Structure formats: structure tokens, C-alpha cells
A protein has these predicted regions:
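Anionic-ligand-binding alpha/beta catalytic cores of soluble enzymes and soluble regulatory domains
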Residues: 177-274
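Active-site-proximal beta-alpha core segment in soluble small-molecule metabolic enzymes
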Residues: 5-10, 14-25, 36-206, 220
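Short beta-strand-to-turn element immediately C-terminal to the catalytic PLP-Schiff-base lysine
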Residues: 140-141, 215-216, 254, 318-320
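Divalent metal-coordination and catalytic microenvironments
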Residues: 23, 77, 209, 251, ...
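C-terminal accessory subdomain/extension
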Residues: 256-394
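Structural beta-strand/beta-sheet cores of well-ordered domains, especially the beta-sheet scaffolds
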Residues: 105, 203, 222, 226, ...
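Fold-independent oxyanion-binding glycine-rich loops
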Residues: 42-44, 70-71, 110-112, 131-133, ...
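Solvent-exposed alpha-helices and their adjacent loops that cap or buttress functional pockets
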Residues: 32-34, 100, 121-122, 128, ...
Length: 394
């Protein structure tokens, strides 16, 4: 293939476009709601949008630091040239904390074992003590908190760690009226008092992620850890954020079929009337949930049309309807599977709803390994393949 032909292929295939200006706008919108700092949580490849692209766009919107759930992600930020503070939580106790500290990465400490490991491997490391504020997931159980704070203070006096933060996390922030939120807030306030009482002076006190930041100022403290909100997901439904993703693909073929034509694996759908079927070269290997057939809609030739039959590994069938005057779609036309919703196209929230999942799950599953990824905004357009963090042009 000539370079021109390659380029042609590249511009007409399935394409996931990431508009990083949405990320910047979202951070700005969130910053207007809180006096605290914004930590951009760019775990899971920036919620499937691209770690470095989301990180850069978040800084442009006023985020001042990063949060990740593995040291690998922290190093990826450093390798990409980001010098801001990075906090990593969820690290196994035998992680390379020495390497983390040398890279200037702050470490969450959910208990004595982590504290000992950090003190041994990375004397002087900056740590955030992590309190379980009601999830029974990550963080020290409240009954171990006092002891953890005192042990940490002793380690700090001996020069083994510096406790720069205290963190908690709310289980039910997406439901602002849920009683667990009040309990979580009180537990966190207690946790901070205990830390201060033990002689610790944590400058960073953080409880809120996106939903709590948007819906409850009492959770704000000195900083918010924002992940979903970066990419336009607001579970609390209280603020209008902007989605950054658009997935498009060409119609490979359009065919006319008679009434009674079964479609796809398992023949789960049969055409009730003569109709036209369009074939879209995107499927569950690209992150579309297989079960979304017959509930999902896509936009083609300006109208919403239903997905029919089961979604296959790399293709999806759309019922274009019998009437070309209503949906004048032809082979080669671009189908929008989702976008920010500006022109009536579905959004990733619609897709998540159609399969009964969270938008977070839907967006983090997208993209590997076939979708071409294009980043737009901030005066750059770059191309690459998702899942590889690659960008061919910059
Ligand atoms: C993922 C995560 C966040 C970010 O949460 P969002 O709701 O996506 O903003 C914050 N804190 C912790 C501990 C997390 O694991």
C-alpha cells in the first residue's frame, strides 16, 4: 500500500476520537465548585481516554496533581514528562516503594504492613494514611486507625516517612441522600482529628471523588480526587459536564432483505418487514457490550437507528428501515455509535444504560486493540492505536 492508501484506510475505519478540550472544560467547571485542589485520577489509561492526553488536558483546566492505582501508571506519568505530585494507592505490600520514592511518587498507606514496607524501602517517603470510611474495601479499618496514626507518627519522628495526607472514600456518593454519606463524612472528620491528636500534620485531607465533589461541599476538605468527572461522567447528575469520546465507523455494506430474515448469531432478531440492513465494523472486541443488540441505537444519516441481532466480535448490524427517504444511508456513510450528544447522537451514558452497567465500565472497556484513536483539541491532532498509548503524529 502506498502511504496515501494507508492514510485513506486510516481515515475511514472505526475511529475513537478523544476531544481533550472537554477534559479541560470539565476540570474548570469542577474547580468553580470547590476551593480545594483537584487531583486528576488518571487510572485505567485515563478512564480509557489515554493517560497522558487526559493528564495534560486536566492540568490545562487547573488540576495540580495526579492520582493512580499502580506504580506503573505513576511511572508512565513521569516518563511522559509530568513533574507534578503523583499519589499511588492500591499497591501490593511488596511493591518497589524505593523506586516509587525516587520517582517522587507519594504512597497511600492502608495499614501497618504497608507502613513498615515503605519505611524500610523508602526512608523519608511521602505517604497518605488511608482510612476506610465505609466501604470495607481499601483503607485501614477504623478500629486500627488510632494505632496506625501513632505508629506513623513514631516512624515520622524517626525520619522513616513523612505523613503528608489523610484520605477516605465514600461508597454511596452517587446517591447524595444516602445515609452512608453522613456516616462516611463523620468518620473522616474523626480520622483527621485522631491523626492531629497523634501529632501528625497532614496538609492534604481528601475524601471526595467526582460525585461527592459535585454534590456535597461538606466532603471537600483540601482536595478532591476527580476521575470520572474528567471525562464527563457525573453519577450524581447534578452538574453538566462534557463527554470527550466519539466513536464512528463507516457502513461497510447496505443490503435489502425481505420480511422474516433472521440476523446474526443465534438468530435472536428476525426482520418483521422488508428492510435495509447496514453493517458496521465494530463489535465486542472493541468494547461494545454483546448484549446491547436490540436496545442500542446509533446515528446514521442524521437519524437514530436500532442495532439488531447480537453484536459480534468485530461487527454490528443496524436496521436502517425500509425507506431511504427517512434514512438515506449508503455504504461508506459514517455511523456515529456515540458522541457528546450535540446533534442527537447517543452518548456513552446511553450505552451504559442499555446494558445496565455503569458508564465507567463502558468507557474503560473501549478501544483495544483495533480502534484507531484520534486526539483532538488544544491545537494538536494525533493518531494512534488505542491500548498502546501510542501516538504516531504529534
Ligand atoms: C477511582 C477513584 C477515585 C476517582 O473516582 P471518580 O468517582 O471516578 O471521580 C477517587 N478515589 C479513589 C480511592 C478511587 O479509587
Amino acid at each position: 500500500m502506498t502511504p496515501a492508501a494507508l492514510q485513506q484506510t486510516a481515515t475511514t475505519g472505526p475511529t475513537l476520537t478523544v476531544d481533550v478540550t472537554a477534559v479541560t472544560a470539565n476540570v474548570r467547571a469542577i474547580r468553580r465548585l470547590t476551593a480545594g485542589e483537584v487531583m486528576a485520577v488518571v487510572k485505567s489509561d485515563g478512564f480509557g481516554h489515554g493517560l497522558a492526553d487526559v493528564a495534560r488536558a486536566a492540568l490545562a483546566g487547573g488540576a495540580t496533581r495526579f492520582g493512580v492505582t499502580s506504580l506503573e501508571e505513576a511511572y508512565a506519568l513521569r516518563d511522559a514528562g509530568f513533574t507534578q505530585p503523583v499519589l499511588s494507592w492500591l499497591n501490593p505490600v511488596d511493591s518497589d516503594f524505593g523506586g516509587a520514592a525516587r520517582a517522587g511518587v507519594e504512597i497511600a498507606v492502608p495499614g501497618d504492613a504497608h507502613l513498615r514496607a515503605v519505611a524500610r524501602q523508602a526512608p523519608g517517603a511521602r505517604v497518605h494514611l488511608q482510612l476506610d470510611t465505609g466501604m470495607a474495601r481499601d483503607g485501614a479499618p477504623p478500629e486500627q486507625w488510632e494505632s496506625l496514626c501513632h505508629t506513623a507518627r513514631r516512624a515520622e519522628r524517626a525520619g522513616f516517612v513523612r505523613v503528608v495526607g489523610v484520605m477516605g472514600h465514600l461508597a454511596c456518593a452517587a446517591e447524595p441522600g444516602h445515609p452512608a454519606n453522613g456516616r462516611g463524612r463523620e468518620l473522616f472528620d474523626w480520622g483527621v482529628r485522631v491523626a492531629l491528636g497523634a501529632g501528625l500534620r497532614p496538609r492534604d485531607r481528601h475524601l471526595a471523588a467526582t460525585a461527592a465533589t459535585l454534590s456535597d461541599p461538606r466532603t471537600h476538605h483540601s482536595l478532591s480526587r476527580i476521575g470520572a468527572g474528567l471525562v464527563g461522567i457525573d453519577e450524581s447528575g447534578s452538574v453538566r459536564l462534557r463527554r470527550a469520546l466519539r466513536l464512528t465507523a463507516p457502513l461497510v455494506t447496505v443490503r435489502t432483505v425481505p420480511a422474516g430474515t433472521p440476523v446474526g448469531y443465534g438468530h435472536t432478531w428476525t426482520s418483521p418487514r422488508a428492510t435495509r440492513l447496514g453493517l458496521v465494523p465494530v463489535g465486542y472486541a472493541d468494547g461494545l457490550p454483546r448484549g446491547a443488540g436490540e436496545r442500542a441505537l446509533v446515528q446514521v444519516a442524521g437519524v437514530r437507528r436500532p442495532v439488531v441481532g447480537r453484536i459480534s466480535m468485530d461487527m454490528t448490524v443496524v436496521d436502517l428501515g425500509p425507506d431511504p427517504a427517512v434514512c438515506p444511508a449508503r455504504a461508506g456513510d459514517v455511523v456515529t455509535l456515540f458522541g457528546p450528544g450535540d446533534t442527537g447522537e447517543p452518548t456513552t451514558a446511553d450505552w451504559a444504560r442499555w446494558v445496565g452497567t455503569l458508564e465507567h465500565e463502558f468507557v474503560t472497556a473501549l478501544g483495544r486493540p483495533r480502534l484507531r484513536r484520534v486526539v483532538i483539541g488544544h491545537g494538536v491532532t494525533s493518531h494512534g492505536v488505542t491500548g498502546q498509548g501510542e501516538q504516531a503524529a504529534r
